[in-house]
Every structure is written in structure tokens, then in C-alpha cells.
């Protein structure tokens, strides 16, 4: 019986994990790396980890405790970075662990985890840098554009020409183009794009140096109709998972027994019940959960 329950719990945990990574893909607006290119060389691997930390630093992620930062990569990313970091001077104990379990350990202050559920993002048909803004001085989460020359999919990352990100404390330009994520599919010929975060050039929540100019070019991360794996690095405050204890049914109307267990904030309810009509003894497991991107600016996608 315990083996059956463990198998069912594993299936549920996998689905929670998959939904969490998909939530991260759709809500994270920072993205670096070259989609389709794995960091298989030493130079590319170092650039990947350094670039991730740079973007998190620019976004104001805490630096005092680097154990707050994690990186979740798919199997190909794990394998390529293991290959790319061969020959670097490292703590012998870390190298021993890598050799023993085939998993990269803690590269450049990032707590690493391999996950087969890392999401695959597919861009729409819009050509990378041919669409433009229609009208200067725009702000907010909906940007008016000239009729799109193709589709743009939800989760796609974009930039606007000459619109840089700012340090969240000093409001000084980081020198890096501000990135945004498209929050709803946009059809071919559409004249607006929904984005996150809201474009805010002034005030307490300023996140860009300026609004895009009229006819500013919109550049899409990746290529038209291209797909990439959305490996994700994040500070521990970027995302949250909530699980809620559920109602315990009375032992009647077929319910034989119930149990609910919580550990580290994870709650599972097990219900055992009998179907008298069909003479079948059943057992089900339930979880009630939800993911949220609390501070998505403290996350970055590394596309491969």
C-alpha cells in the first residue's frame, strides 16, 4: 500500500513542479543566453553563470546571502555545463560530488537543480525586429503598436529600442535594455501588446529610463517561430507556492477513513472510500495549491 501511495504522491509532486516551472516561464521577463545554444565550452559556461548573476544583481536581488539564489536547468543544460566546466579549479569535495552523481553542484553561488519539467517556449511568427511602437510617451501594461507582421505568443520576451532598465533603488540606468514578457497572445495584425511589468518611466515604481519613442523597434528574444528551453534562475523571494489544508469528510456515505499530512508547508489529503454499487475499494490523494510570481524581477530565464 505504501508503495502505491508513494507512486501517487510522486505523480502529484511532478505536476506541481511542472506547473511551477511553467508559471516561471510565463511570468519571468528577464532573459539571457542564445536560444538553441548550450554552454558546452568553458567560456560559455562561465558566461552563463556570470550573466545570470549580473542580471539578478542589476534587478536588486540580495547579494549578501548567495544561498538565496537557485538555478533550475533541464538535463541538456546540466550535461553541457558539466562538460563546459571541466578543467576549472574547484573545491575537491564539489568535484567529487559532481563525479559521483553526474549533477553540477553550486556554480558561482547558484544552488543548482536539474529538472526534466523545465518549460519549452515557442515564439510566434512575428519577425524578431521589424515591429514598431505606434505613438510616443506610452506607459502601463498595454502598448499600442503598428499592425503586427506576425503573431506574438504569451510568455515571449521583448525589448523596446533605447528603453533601458534602471536600478530599483537609485533609478539609474543599468545600461541594459529593459525586458518585458508578453502576457496574452497577440494575433497577426494586432495593434496592441499586453506586457509585464507595466512600463513605468517615472515615480516611486520607475523601472525604465524612458517611454519608447514613436516607431521604436520592438525586438523579440529568440527567433520567429523558434523554441527554446526556459531554464530559470531566481532569488528565493521571486516565486511562492501555497498549499492549503482541505476539508476532512466525515466517515460516512462510503468514506472509510481519511488522513491529512503536512510537511514543510506541503499538505496532502488521503481519502479511502468504498463504492458499494460496484463493490470497489478506492483511495484518492488530493492537494490544493497555487503558484504566484511575487517578485518576478528577481528571476531570469537562460534560454537554450
What is the predicted role of each segment?
Residues 87-124, 200, 211-304:
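Protruding loop/beta-arch "assembly-hinge" segments enriched in small, turn-prone residues
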Residues 204-209:
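A short macromolecule-binding patch
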Residues 79-198, 202, 301-302:
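Autoprocessing Asn-cyclization modules and mimics
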Residues 3, 7-62, 76-80, 122-147, ...:
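Alpha-helical scaffold segments that mediate packing/assembly in large oligomeric complexes
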Residues 13, 76, 117, 160, ...:
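Residue-level marker of positions within ordered structural domains that often coincide
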Residues 1, 53-83, 256-259, 272-281, ...:
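Structured, hydrophobic secondary-structure cores that serve as assembly/anchoring elements
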Residues 73-75, 197, 285-287:
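Pocket-edge structural micro-motifs
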Residues 8, 70-71, 158:
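Short hydrophobic/aromatic-rich beta-strand motifs
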Amino acid at each position: 500500500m505504501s508503495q502505491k501511495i508513494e507512486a501517487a504522491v510522486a505523480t502529484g509532486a511532478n505536476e506541481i513542479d511542472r506547473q511551477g516551472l511553467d508559471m516561471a516561464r510565463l511570468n519571468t521577463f528577464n532573459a539571457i543566453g542564445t536560444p538553441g545554444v548550450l554552454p558546452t565550452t568553458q567560456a560559455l559556461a562561465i558566461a552563463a553563470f556570470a550573466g545570470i548573476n549580473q542580471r539578478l544583481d542589476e534587478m536588486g536581488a540580495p547579494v549578501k546571502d548567495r544561498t538565496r539564489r537557485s538555478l533550475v536547468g533541464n538535463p541538456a543544460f546540466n550535461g553541457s555545463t558539466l562538460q563546459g566546466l571541466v578543467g576549472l579549479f574547484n573545491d575537491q569535495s564539489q568535484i567529487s560530488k559532481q563525479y559521483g552523481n553526474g549533477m553540477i553542484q553550486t556554480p558561482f553561488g547558484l544552488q543548482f537543480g536539474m529538472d526534466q519539467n523545465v518549460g519549452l517556449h515557442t515564439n510566434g511568427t512575428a519577425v524578431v525586429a521589424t515591429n514598431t511602437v505606434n505613438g510616443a510617451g506610452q506607459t502601463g501594461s498595454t502598448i499600442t503598436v503598428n499592425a503586427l507582421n506576425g503573431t506574438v505568443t504569451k510568455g515571449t520576451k521583448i525589448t523596446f529600442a533605447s528603453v533601458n532598465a534602471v536600478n530599483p533603488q537609485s533609478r539609474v540606468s543599468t545600461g541594459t535594455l529593459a525586458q518585458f514578457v508578453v502576457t496574452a497572445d497577440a494575433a497577426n495584425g494586432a495593434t496592441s501588446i499586453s506586457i509585464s511589468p507595466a512600463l513605468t518611466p517615472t515615480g516611486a515604481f520607475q523601472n525604465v529610463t524612458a517611454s519608447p519613442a514613436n516607431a521604436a523597434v520592438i525586438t523579440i528574444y529568440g527567433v520567429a517561430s523558434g523554441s527554446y528551453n526556459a531554464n530559470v534562475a531566481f532569488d528565493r523571494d521571486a516565486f511562492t507556492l501555497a498549499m492549503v489544508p482541505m476539508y476532512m469528510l466525515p466517515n460516512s456515505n462510503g468514506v472509510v477513513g481519511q488522513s491529512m499530512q503536512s510537511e514543510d508547508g506541503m499538505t496532502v489529503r488521503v481519502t479511502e472510500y468504498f463504492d458499494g454499487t460496484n463493490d470497489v475499494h478506492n483511495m484518492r490523494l488530493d492537494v490544493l495549491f497555487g503558484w504566484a510570481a511575487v517578485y518576478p524581477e528577481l528571476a531570469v530565464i537562460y534560454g537554450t
